[in-house]
Amino acid sequence: MKKKLVLIDGSSVAYRAFFALPLLHNDKGIHTNAVYGFTMMLNKILAEEEPTHMLVAFDAGKTTFRHEAFQEYKGGRQQTPPELSEQFPLLRELLRAYRIPAYELENYEADDIIGTLAARAEQEGFEVKVISGDRDLTQLASPHVTVDITKKGITDIEPYTPEAVREKYGLTPEQIVDLKGLMGDKSDNIPGVPGIGEKTAVKLLRQFGTVENVLASIDEIKGEKLKETLRQHREMALLSKKLAAIRRDAPVELSLDDIAYQGEDREKVVALFKELGFQSFLEKMESPSSEEEKPLAKMAFTLADRVTEEMLADKAALVVEVVEENYHDAPIVGIAVVNEHGRFFLRPETALADPQFVAWLGDETKKKSMFDSKRAAVALKWKGIELCGVSFDLLLAAYLLDPAQGVDDVAAAAKMKQYEAVRPDEAVYGKGAKRAVPDEPVLAEHLVRKAAAIWALERPFLDELRRNEQDRLLVELEQPLSSILAEMEFAGVKVDTKRLEQMGEELAEQLRTVEQRIYELAGQEFNINSPKQLGVILFEKLQLPVLKKSKTGYSTSADVLEKLAPYHEIVENILQHYRQLGKLQSTYIEGLLKVVRPDTKKVHTIFNQALTQTGRLSSTEPNLQNIPIRLEEGRKIRQAFVPSESDWLIFAADYSQIELRVLAHIAEDDNLMEAFRRDLDIHTKTAMDIFQVSEDEVTPNMRRQAKAVNFGIVYGISDYGLAQNLNISRKEAAEFIERYFESFPGVKRYMENIVQEAKQKGYVTTLLHRRRYLPDITSRNFNVRSFAERMAMNTPIQGSAADIIKKAMIDLNARLKEERLQARLLLQVHDELILEAPKEEMERLCRLVPEVMEQAVTLRVPLKVDYHYGSTWYDAK
């Protein structure tokens, strides 16, 4: 389980709670509104975030190191109302009852405690959530640190990831301190530079990166008055930045182990709530929660020592239990069957040795209802046993009803229908390193309860799917696909380990060469993988411009290095060669070699069929969908994927621009449909429109930019996002998008209509009626709402493309069997299908595969498939 640290800015949240709620007091006349609001927030965080570690930070006193640097810091702030001051001791008592550590540090602010612990936790691999009412903390946002800013109400929050910070301010989180340095902050009495507001500050920082760079480049700035102001207030700008910067190295004398969350002291919490008069919280605590472990009513079943006729009914719910996450060749620990005759538990050694039971498992006419049937099917295949006749899969049904639920066991699916007679797998097996199979009586009851739940839930799930017009999606698409994926997983993909090892040696040699070149350019040897040492070389020795600082010194992140590439050859070597080659070596070469099975010489991936919200498949252990294609060295890794038989070849077929073709169909845009019907190069056509040039005048760069516009539109991209992608101004990006919509007005109409439809219905659908619910589409938070709107635009397109390729897999599998070909599906990678087949079947596949794929569905525009074959996956291009 991923460790998660929640850090709360206690003073800020208490202040917000106090002013968000009317003055409340208990029967002793003590004011309690801030404590009440704080409790609301705590309960919400504990329920939603499930933190493993937690701390509330408070300001220690009125003076800090910032006051020493600038006496007027926070001057002019109103005194804390006495009605709030008297509640701080109660807040401390509340935290003691909840067993959440509270911490303050002399000479520092709560922000510095939070910044320091967030930095430590991130380095230790934690996910971190910061809660505050102070936007200054958005500077802490990073890939693993999210900052939730409370808004008007105490539980109404605005989440800030690095992307959200960029969306709101047009700056990175690291630049927030530079923003304060230039424009100041009235709430903290940080002066900044007189006359510079947010707009000017953002403009300067987007041009120069930091306050220091702005001050070093005054001569390049337009406007004499602005130049003079910056010269006069240079020191104040630097001081203001220093005042705004949150410390990441405060002397916090706590370890992360010290703030592990152990759960509340229930007795103390109840006693405190009674004292404070928090009746509503008391009622929630005293009423049994559906989340709590409740004793289940007894369920009668037979613990059978042999297979009997009544177990082998025409219809049954079946559980074939595999506890290990990777179910390839994993032990089956138990089997449960529930049907009209009763409930039965069978030991696997009994059931799987019985010819009648094995025949029943493989009988297509004996209908079986299961949860995640693919898992059981693959585990059985490794034992030479076939599973057929799966007529209902609860996992897939739950996934279709709401893909955002993240259903991962029978209990989670049961919860969707308020069925409570089954426990979560984690409650029985434990989790992580403590996961283990319990004694047989406990195991038997758990498996029987799971089978009984599947038996009881099939009808209500199917009824709702029918109401949603999704029953055919389950029965005709997802369930048949599950069987095909099981075959693909079990078959695996053969890997030429010698070739992979050879590539590893070649990469290692390239890395050594690049390493030596970097040392030559640096004039000394150093640890290239150390951001600290690399920062010293780049910014102190080679004097490259400092674009941003990290919590530990100079930032040497990929985005920084990309901007520095024109300044020195060493940067290109570090970024494009050393880092990329290093990742290929560690992630792909070494990573793949670790998962090749010695007995089959293959990798056996796991396709996740019920994970993404768009319906796309993903794969894990290993992830074969992210084998790199941009870098030639990365593409070469595909040379190691070879056919299973010596006289076979790899055949690859992929849909050409399927998402844009789906967009043309859904939007019914005449110009876009006409372009595809005439088989025009759609990116060239778009370039002609947005640059207003003839076909002959379209340059490769214009086509590249047009391609970014085409695919950006599919994802509901904003002018800001497009500007970032193409490294152009927002104005240019806005003009590109405007011209695109002028050329394809049907697309604009579709984008507007689909967002309105999502707001009315709460969801969007694909061509085959797959739904994606978008509860945030009406959010008052602009960033949250905008993201939901982009999902509304994209999901019908991406989801329909996913549906089409799934349908193509089913149709193709059927045709291969119908024509008695030996060819078989190996992989599905985004819009591409990979097969292997004997050489003599290639000619037939060149006709059959594109024919089947192009006829999977009928659109208003033709589907187009490109195909190639060769002795390796790399050669099939």
UniProtKB/Swiss-Prot annotation:
Residue stretches in coiled coil: none
Enzyme Commission number(s): 2.7.7.7
5'-3' exonuclease domain location: 1-310
Xref: InterPro entries: 3'-5'_exonuclease_dom (IPR002562), 5-3_exonucl_a-hlix_arch_N (IPR020046), 5-3_exonuclease (IPR002421), 5-3_exonuclease_C_sf (IPR036279), DNA-dir_DNA_pol_A_CS (IPR019760), DNA-dir_DNA_pol_A_palm_dom (IPR001098), DNA/RNA_pol_sf (IPR043502), DNA_polI_exonuclease (IPR054690)
One of the Pfam families matching this protein, by short name: DNA_pol_A
GO molecular function: 3'-5' exonuclease activity; 5'-3' exonuclease activity; DNA binding; DNA-directed DNA polymerase activity
Catalytic activity: DNA(n) + a 2'-deoxyribonucleoside 5'-triphosphate = DNA(n+1) + diphosphate
Swiss-Prot/TrEMBL GO biological process terms: DNA-templated DNA replication; double-strand break repair
Disulfide bonds: none
DNA-binding recorded as keyword: yes
Record's subunit section: Single-chain monomer with multiple functions.
Protein name in UniProt: DNA polymerase I
Organism expressing this protein natively: Bacillus caldotenax
